[in-house]
């Protein structure tokens, strides 16, 4: 059983995301949508209220719902992405190529993400036509952003109750369990920052107290000057 898991607050990008799911993703997916009553026309859709006040808890809650309903494969999606005709096909192909015993997150690339996940990243090597040659490779990384990312429910680890740094900490916790994270060749368009806005300093400062109290070793590593 496979589920697409989405949490939203303002839902302003949902109609386009929903249209791309309807057009391009197989109907064996059940869509879990927290924060909106939108029902997709071709996919079984389960909606719920999103009462959480941060990204981490918003997704923890809706992921728990999907897991409790017996879904083993989860495609966790931000509410402001758009699938292409080839996203799922490419991601499914890559899942078959990655060793399963220690597979954690398998994330798509996008045009609004950090590091290697971003197709704008300046990769080594020559361009291959209209792409970077490295876009044709599956890349193992320490941290991914689950903008659109696949995970097995048995490997799920809760996000901390944060907006920023929630994905960093979750990925580190999963690595401690022996799991590895990968960037797929698959791609989604990502609008970006539709809920929290473009406020990096403010969002960082809001996360520091929790990290200092609960993950002091990471606070020492990340915020020495704060």
Regions found by a protein language model. Name each.
Residues 1-20:
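N-proximal low-complexity "stem/linker" segments adjacent to membrane-targeting elements
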Residues 19-28:
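Short, acidic, metal-binding catalytic loop of nucleotide-sugar glycosyltransferases
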Residues 49-66:
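Glycine-rich, basic loop-to-helix element that forms the pyrophosphate-binding segment
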Residues 72-82:
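Short beta-strand-to-loop acidic/aromatic patch adjacent to the donor-nucleotide binding site
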Residues 86-105:
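Conserved donor-nucleotide/metal-binding helix-loop-beta segment in metal-dependent transferases, i.e.
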Residues 104-121:
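Short beta-strand-to-loop element that shapes/binds the nucleotide-sugar donor at the catalytic cleft/hinge
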Residues 129-151, 163:
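A recurrent flexible, glycine/aromatic-enriched loop bordering the glycosyltransferase active site
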Residues 161-226:
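C-terminal catalytic/acceptor-binding lobe
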């Amino acid at each position: 059983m496979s589920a697409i898991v989405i949490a939203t607050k303002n839902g302003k990008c949902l109609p386009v995301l929903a249209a791309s799911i309807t057009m391009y993703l197989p109907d064996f997916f059940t869509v879990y949508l927290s924060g909106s009553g939108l029902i997709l026309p071709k996919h079984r859709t389960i909606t719920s209220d999103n009462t959480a006040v941060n990204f981490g808890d918003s997704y923890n809650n809706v992921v728990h719902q999907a897991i409790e309903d017996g879904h083993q494969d989860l495609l966790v999606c931000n509410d402001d992405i758009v699938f292409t005709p080839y996203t799922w096909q490419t991601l499914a192909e890559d899942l078959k190529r990655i060793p399963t015993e220690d597979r954690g997150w398998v994330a798509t690339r996008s045009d609004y993400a950090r590091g290697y996940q971003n197709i704008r990243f300046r990769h080594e090597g020559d361009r291959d036509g209209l792409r970077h040659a490295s876009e044709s490779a599956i890349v193992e990384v320490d941290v991914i952003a689950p903008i659109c990312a696949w995970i097995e429910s048995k490997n799920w680890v809760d996000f901390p109750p944060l907006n920023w740094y929630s994905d960093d900490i979750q990925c580190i916790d999963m690595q401690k369990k022996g799991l590895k994270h990968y960037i797929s060749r698959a791609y989604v368009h990502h609008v970006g920052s539709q809920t929290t806005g473009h406020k990096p300093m403010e969002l960082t400062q809001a996360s520091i107290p929790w990290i200092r109290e609960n993950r002091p070793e990471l606070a020492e590593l990340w915020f020495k000057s704060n």
